[in-house]
UniProtKB/Swiss-Prot annotation:
This is Proline--tRNA ligase. PROSITE patterns: AA_TRNA_LIGASE_II. Keywords: Aminoacyl-tRNA synthetase, ATP-binding, Cytoplasm, Ligase, Nucleotide-binding, Protein biosynthesis. It is an enzyme of class 6 (ligase).
Length: 575
């Protein structure tokens, strides 16, 4: 591609409304332009990157045995009503009516459509397993679109759906798709982790997320320092610590006026927060009168409640909701800052770490008072459970090493859906006995457009993007010095351009007549082109060309006759 005939829409200024580096650089490098909140135009350079990601995804899906289909973005409400999600999904589902007042939605996902398609096409267990995928635009009406294409309302996604006659068959395909996802992210060149995850609104049983590690990530990923274990913090098990061995001391009630927080209590009583417990009162399941009961959740003072773990408890309402202050006061006789586990007349769940304490500090269920030297023999009947988030340094649940936590950007998610949709929508085949058998489903998603932004979050410096070779808009930039005035420079540039193109490289020849050398060099850095060749008269007189790898700070001189072989090796090694 010649720069003189190509839209290079770079600019120097950092947009004021771009919060994360990927959004800033995608705008500055001329990859995207904002159309409206959460909606973006993809410019030529950006689309090149997007298509390369798409190609890698498509190749690995084909290799995994999935068949490509294409389903409509606009979906009839009837299918969503049939699955039960028309009302459940919430405002993220953009609902529309056509001219005949028939209800539709813009698809945020395609479980209903694929289930409807396959229930009409597959008739026998002999046709299973079957795996279908598409690369299609999705729309989710995010309440607050942000971070550019990272959390846009309209985005490009690869979603695949598999159909099976048995759980064992689903597991086989699930493992194949898991491996395919790893291959995709390996080929792109991302630092990622597959992690155990919650199924969320999609539903189902087993689930893994694929996270690109980046400081700007919105999710906390817990992983072992000595094994491959990794899980979303929400799902990582917090193992029970050894019980403290101190002898129980007599419990004392002490005045703690105007003290509401764990930190303030610990400071006033001169104890570490690790020797305190906090009691959270949440809404429980409804009683016979249709009113919410109350449930107490007790944690060590320095630990945070894990909502996902909490809602799995028998007495806790879903979604998790804290009880209002008036209800707490009426039930316990004290305000939030003075609550404790002793003397409660409601279900009490105590986290493992809190249960290991001896002689701890807790609220006395009396405004302005706490207990010191409290012990679990004093407390109401309770059940010991895991309801906290893991923290750095915790022993890993796998038994190897300790927990480290990093931020991650979710770029893929795979689910074992089971029969959630096939049962609701009566998607079945005839089994070997001629009887109806509900198909078991798997679901596999990758955020194609999100991968582009995620790759930037891992690969940039002060000068711009540093693309991995596999998805760079161009592999090589040829930058001439005074091409319009030097026949030798022009000839060598054209020669290199032809040779590299013939070898299958995407090449950008910076042949814009009025462009300055400094501006051209800055643009190639900003756009993240991995390999750059500068052609000038001085170098040619010495039989040399200046080469610079985008990842390196310094350039080097390469013999003219060796440059093609050098580029071949550089692209192969990524250096």
């Amino acid at each position: 591609m010649r720069a003189s005939k190509y839209l290079i829409a770079t600019y120097k200024e950092t947009p004021a409304d771009a919060e994360v580096i990927s959004h800033q650089l995608m705008l500055r490098a001329g990859l995207i332009r904002k159309l409206a909140s959460g909606l973006y135009n993809w410019l030529p350079a950006g689309l090149r990157v997007l298509r390369k990601v798409e190609t890698i995804v498509r190749e690995e899906m084909d290799r995994a045995g999935a068949q490509e289909v294409l389903m409509p973005v606009v979906q009839p409400a009837e299918l969503w009503e049939e699955s039960g999600r028309w009302q459940q999904y919430g405002p993220e589902l953009l609902r529309i009516n056509d001219r005949h007042d028939r209800a539709f939605c813009l698809g945020p996902t395609h479980e209903e459509v694929i289930t409807d398609l396959i229930r009409n096409e597959l008739k026998s267990y002999k046709q299973l397993p079957a795996n279908f995928y598409q690369i299609q635009t999705k729309f989710r009406d995010e309440v607050r679109p942000r971070f550019g294409v990272m959390r846009a309302r309209e985005f490009l996604m690869k979603d695949a759906y598999s159909f099976h006659a048995s759980q064992e068959c689903l597991q086989e395909t699930y493992d194949i798709m898991h491996a395919a996802y790893c291959k995709i992210f390996d080929r792109i060149g991302l630092d990622y982790r597959p992690v155990l995850a919650d199924t969320g609104s999609i539903g189902g049983t087993g689930s893994h997320e694929f996270h690109v590690l980046a400081d700007s990530g919105e999710d906390d990923i817990a992983f072992s320092t000595e094994s491959n274990f990794a899980a979303n913090v929400e799902l990582a098990e917090a193992l029970a610590p050894a019980k403290q061995t101190a002898e129980p001391l007599p419990r004392e009630e002490v005045a703690t006026p105007n003290v509401k927080t764990i930190e303030d209590v610990a400071k006033l009583l001169d104890v570490p927060t690790t020797q305190t417990v906090k009691t959270l009162i949440v809404k429980g399941v409804e009683n016979e009168d249709g009113k919410h009961t109350l449930v107490a959740l007790v944690l060590r003072g320095d630990h945070a409640l894990n909502d996902i773990k909490a809602i799995k408890l028998a007495h806790v309402a879903n979604p998790l909701e804290f009880a209002d202050e008036s209800g707490i006061k009426a039930a316990v006789g004290a305000e939030v800052g003075s609550l404790g586990p002793i003397g409660l007349s409601m279900p009490v769940y105590v986290d493992r770490a809190a249960a290991a304490l001896v002689n701890f500090v807790c609220g006395a269920n009396k405004d302005g008072y706490h207990y010191t030297n409290a012990n679990w023999s004093d407390a109401a009947e309770h059940k010991v459970v895991d309801i906290r988030n893991v923290v750095i340094g915790d022993p890993s649940p796998c038994g190897k090493g300790t927990i480290d936590i990093k931020r991650g950007i979710e770029v893929g998610h795979i689910f074992q859906l089971g029969t959630k949709y096939s049962e609701a929508m009566k998607a079945s085949v005839l089994d070997e006995n001629g009887k109806d058998k509900t198909m078991i489903m798997g679901c596999y998603g990758i955020g194609v457009s999100r991968i582009v932004a995620s790759a930037i979050e891992q690969n940039y410096d002060d000068n711009g993007i540093i693309w991995p070779d596999a998805i760079a808009p161009f592999h090589v930039a040829i930058v001439p010095i005074n091409m319009q005035k030097s026949e030798a420079v022009a000839q060598k540039c054209e020669e290199l351009y032809a040779q590299l193109n013939q070898l299958g490289y995407d090449v950008l020849l910076m042949d814009e007549p009025k462009a300055r050398l400094g501006g051209m060099l800055a643009d190639t850095e900003l756009m993240g082109i991995p390999h750059r060749i500068v052609v000038g008269d001085r170098g040619l007189e010495k039989g040399q060309l200046e080469y610079k790898c985008r990842r390196d700070s310094d350039s080097q001189d390469i013999a003219v006759d060796d440059i093609i072989e050098f580029i071949n090796n550089a692209v192969k090694t990524g250096k």
